[in-house]
């Protein structure tokens, strides 16, 4: 289960980074902001999983 969450975090980070870059490239501030928000969500999920791993071991 934790592996699924880690993969989901990486996917959110990559998707958000790509969306933010695309938004900046076309001058769409809303798309860039949404992409950054998705990346941040992935960052938060990854931090949560790392914290869980610390207490697991």
Swiss-Prot record:
SUPFAM superfamilies: Hypothetical protein YjbJ (SSF69047). Gene3D superfamilies: YjbJ. Signal peptide: none annotated. Residues 1-57 are annotated as: Disordered. It comes from the Bacteria. It holds the Pfam family CsbD. Residues 1-15, 36-57 have a biased composition (Basic and acidic residues). Coiled coil: none annotated. Belongs to the UPF0337 (CsbD) family. This is UPF0337 protein SAV_1088. It comes from Streptomyces avermitilis (strain ATCC 31267 / DSM 46492 / JCM 5070 / NBRC 14893 / NCIMB 12804 / NRRL 8165 / MA-4680).
């Amino acid at each position: 289960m934790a592996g699924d969450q880690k993969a989901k975090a990486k996917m959110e980070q990559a998707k958000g980074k790509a969306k933010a870059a695309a938004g900046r490239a076309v001058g769409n501030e809303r798309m860039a902001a949404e992409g950054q928000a998705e990346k941040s969500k992935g960052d938060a999920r990854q931090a949560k999983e790392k914290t869980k791993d610390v207490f697991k071991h």
